[in-house]
């Protein structure tokens, strides 16, 4: 199976075109050769017509091309009529997506008024009880028939009204039926979506796209790769468009890094027709990050140099860290083998940050690049390595994007029968992140980039390679601020699931279903818990998708009703209807009860 033509050359996947709305009146065509489309979601209560109209207009004004609105009930779905009318009255014809969970009847109402209906195969026709049950083939076939009966009316109505569908699977909300047959796996996510796609095709309806969202970027990447490979297996006319997103990415740097790893990796491989960066922030921030991320992809992917070898040097459908020997390239520094992925810094960064770092700090440089015996190799040329115990990297100045260069390095080492540990770099042009083709033509000096762009580029490059299982140490040089460079390295490792040095938060982006102010609550929870290294806390705005979407979180804070919070351990609700004013401290109590609490240390000067 293959999900792209080559791991070394960017060639956009040729998807079929689907039409959303009337292109002559503000609608849009996605797929084919059309540019990748930016989508976001408003946070307003769907019954607040004026608020929904205003938020939508604000998004459109900054470049959002598709706007999603939640429709949790038939009443909410019916009010989409008024929202759409308000937008059209103001001359705004942006396509609207109705977000549906659990309620086929809400979907049937929404399809009357909006251009797209998003359904989640995990909960459109199935309930979620986390129940174990073995299905015979006959029982499974009967369940598929039941789903067909529930989903077919929507398909027929979409076809009649010339609407579009998004079949959007979420890792945290797979049905019990899928879980019991395929497990909590990328294969389960893909097969769940294909079941719904087959029903669409039974009725000769093809105006739909797929999404495969997960809060873990590695899982998300595997899912999309597997989906595209499975579509290829099904046949050439299964080339439906793909919507990319990392769900519950959170806010701030962490949300941007997770999204850049997941979305950026796939865009660099030529996948994706629409994208959304899901942040626990005001929706316009999502659009800004989408724009910035899309602008980096041509600079980070190889679309110029054809590389004859197209063999994958890693398994694209199953994450496994590349096997390397453990080595000690300098005194008191080990990497490779079973060691964690190490953080290396330049001598200049070391000299600036080490005076402010204590031995017990989790964020600290672990080696100086100039002190290591690193073999700098050009993977575009022949080379020899005499020992597996030599730490290697790609030489600066190689005229390839970093992702391509490091993948090619792994392929060449593999052909030589070598499995040397690899040090990853965020760029191949020295300190100051500036790809070769962007340098000034006159004096070849690098132009400093904005920190937000450095963050996205480093996350895409390093994160993509880590998701491939490549890398035993990393070096971030693109960020000129030494302290920020060090923090960025650790944040990328945590977002990629390679190291844990702080609390991990799985936080849904706010929407009309949210029962509390997510940004405020997230800040309060972080203030009390951000020192809990290795603990994962989910913060979910509502009960509709909360328990399932918490994925592998240790604890959950979920809106149960207006002003009331339910607390979870894993996916099990433990405390119910806690007043919101007490809920954060009750969460702390719950963490203490399960022996995951440690007292925070006194604040010290942070790295700068």
Residue ranges and their predicted role:
Residues 71-113, 351-355:
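N-terminal active-site wall of soluble small-molecule enzyme domains
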Residues 93-131, 137-157, 162:
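Hydrophobic or amphipathic alpha-helical targeting/insertion segments
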Residues 43, 62-87, 121-142, 208-217, ...:
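Glycine-rich, proline-tolerant flexible connector loops at the mouths of alpha/beta enzymes
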């Amino acid at each position: 199976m293959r999900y792209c033509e080559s791991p070394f050359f960017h060639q956009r996947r040729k998807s079929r075109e689907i039409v959303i709305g009337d292109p002559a009146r503000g609608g849009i065509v996605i797929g084919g050769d059309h540019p990748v489309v930016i989508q976001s979601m408003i946070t307003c209560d769907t019954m607040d017509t004026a608020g929904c109209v205003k938020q939508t207009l604000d998004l459109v004004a900054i470049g959002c091309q598709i706007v999603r609105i939640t429709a949790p009930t038939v009443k909410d779905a019916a009010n989409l009529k008024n929202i759409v009318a308000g937008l059209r009255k103001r001359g705004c014809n942006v396509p609207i997506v109705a977000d549906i969970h659990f309620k086929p009847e809400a979907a049937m109402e929404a399809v009357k008024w909006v251009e797209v209906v998003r359904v989640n195969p995990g909960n459109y026709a199935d309930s979620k009880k986390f129940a174990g049950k073995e299905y015979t083939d006959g029982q499974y076939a009967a369940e598929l028939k039941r789903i067909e009966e529930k989903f077919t009316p929507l398909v027929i109505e979409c076809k009649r009204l010339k609407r579009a569908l998004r079949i959007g699977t979420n890792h945290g909300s797979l049905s019990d039926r899928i879980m019991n047959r395929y497990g909590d796996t990328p294969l389960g996510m893909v097969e769940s979506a294909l079941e719904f796609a087959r029903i669409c095709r039974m009725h000769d309806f093809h105006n739909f796209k797929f999404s495969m969202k997960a809060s873990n970027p590695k899982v998300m990447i595997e899912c999309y790769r597997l989906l595209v490979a499975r579509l290829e297996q099904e046949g050439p006319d299964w080339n439906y468009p793909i919507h990319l997103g990392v769900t519950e990415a959170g806010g701030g740097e962490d949300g941007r890094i997770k999204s850049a790893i997941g979305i950026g990796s796939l865009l660099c491989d030529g996948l994706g027709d629409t994208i959304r960066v899901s942040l626990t922030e005001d929706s316009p921030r999502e659009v800004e990050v989408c724009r910035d991320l899309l602008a980096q992809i041509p600079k980070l992917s190889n679309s110029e140099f054809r590389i004859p070898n197209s063999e994958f040097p890693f398994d694209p459908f199953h994450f496994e860290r590349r096997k390397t020997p453990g080595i000690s390239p300098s005194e008191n520094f080990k990497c490779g083998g079973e060691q964690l992925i190490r953080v290396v810094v330049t001598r200049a960064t070391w000299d600036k940050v080490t005076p402010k770092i204590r031995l017990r700090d989790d964020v600290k440089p672990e080696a100086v690049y100039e002190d290591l015996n690193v073999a700098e190799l050009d993977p575009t040329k022949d080379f020899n390595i005499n020992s597996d115990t030599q730490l290697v990297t790609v030489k600066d100045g190689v005229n390839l994007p970093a992702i391509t260069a490091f993948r090619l390095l792994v392929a060449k080492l593999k052909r030589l029968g070598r499995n040397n540990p690899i040090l990853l770099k965020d760029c191949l042009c020295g300190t100051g992140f500036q790809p070769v083709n962007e340098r000034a033509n006159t004096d070849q000096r690098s132009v400093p980039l904005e920190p937000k762009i450095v963050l996205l580029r480093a996350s895409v490059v390093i994160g993509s390679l880590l998701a491939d299982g490549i890398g035993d140490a990393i070096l971030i040089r693109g960020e000129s601020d030494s302290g920020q460079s060090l923090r960025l390295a650790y944040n990328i490792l945590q977002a990629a699931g390679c190291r844990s040095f702080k609390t991990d938060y799985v936080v849904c982006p706010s929407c009309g279903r949210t029962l509390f102010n997510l940004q405020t609550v997230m800040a309060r929870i972080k203030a009390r818990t951000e020192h809990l290294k290795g603990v994962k806390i989910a913060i979910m705005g509502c009960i509709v998708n909360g328990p399932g979407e918490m994925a592998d979180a240790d604890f959950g804070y979920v809106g149960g009703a207006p002003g009331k919070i339910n607390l979870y351990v894993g996916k099990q609700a433990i405390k119910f209807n806690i007043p919101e004013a007490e809920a954060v401290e009750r969460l702390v109590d719950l963490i203490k009860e399960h022996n995951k609490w440690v007292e925070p240390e006194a604040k010290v000067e942070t790295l700068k």
